[in-house]
């Protein structure tokens, strides 16, 4: 198990779409490639206020969002790449994700200007265009393979909310988990009391004992 704590934020905006998720993944990848993180071997000692990557049987990003020094939200999503912290190698299916490949993926995202094309064909065409424009045609296949994964992997989105403003009894509890981000699939699980990043990690950790829901 490795805990990689980032000293800089990896999410500049709320996560409301797959495009937002991809941006977070690519920003975290940037920091991993450039070694802009600290390694923590004891989760009890990790800074609750900083985003971190938990790497073990599961690989998940945990991203707290603070207002006036108080954590009001904690986002967690699956991290789809493999990272060897000892060798400083970021990869996907034996494809080495280096600065040039990650930069190409960021360029593709920026070209979309906030909206993904409707078809996979248009997306992949843009991947090839970016590689050709940057004299990186030799990385076309790698870019397409990694970007296809980003477009299709199971995001595993969970968000903890401390939401006093919209509190409405049991319909919208002050403390709750939002599962999934789209309006069609999201739902809430109410919490009796607030939790921190470590508690959310424990709830989602597949190597720890399960947590149980208790009906009212």
Question: Model-predicted segments: where are they?
Answer:
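UBC/E2-like fold recognition across ubiquitin and ubiquitin-like conjugation systems
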Residues: 1-130, 209-216
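Generic preference for flexible, low-structure residues
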Residues: 17-22, 163, 174-176
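Basic nucleic-acid-binding interfaces
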Residues: 116-138, 143-171, 214-216
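Long, compositionally biased interface segments
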Residues: 169, 173-216
């Amino acid at each position: 198990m490795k805990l990689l704590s980032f000293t800089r934020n990896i999410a500049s905006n709320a996560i409301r779409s797959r495009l937002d998720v991809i941006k977070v993944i690519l920003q975290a990848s940037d920091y991993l490639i450039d070694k802009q993180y600290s390694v923590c071997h004891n989760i009890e000692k990790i800074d609750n206020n900083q985003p971190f990557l938990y790497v073990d049987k599961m690989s998940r990003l945990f991203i707290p969002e603070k207002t006036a020094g108080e954590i009001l939200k904690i986002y967690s999503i699956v991290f789809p790449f493999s990272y060897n912290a000892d060798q400083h190698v970021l990869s996907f299916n034996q494809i080495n994700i280096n600065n040039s490949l990650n930069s190409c993926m960021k360029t593709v995202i920026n070209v979309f200007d906030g909206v993904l094309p409707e078809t996979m064909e248009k997306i992949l065409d843009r991947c090839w265009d970016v590689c050709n424009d940057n004299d990186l045609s030799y990385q076309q296949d790698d870019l397409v393979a990694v970007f296809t994964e980003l477009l299709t992997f199971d995001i595993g989105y969970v968000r903890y909310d401390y939401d006093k403003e919209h509190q409405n009894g049991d319909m919208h509890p002050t403390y709750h988990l939002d599962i999934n981000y789209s309006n069609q699939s999201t739902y809430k699980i109410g919490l009796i009391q607030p939790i921190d990043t470590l508690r959310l990690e424990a709830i989602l950790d597949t190597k720890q004992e399960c947590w149980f829901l208790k009906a009212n």
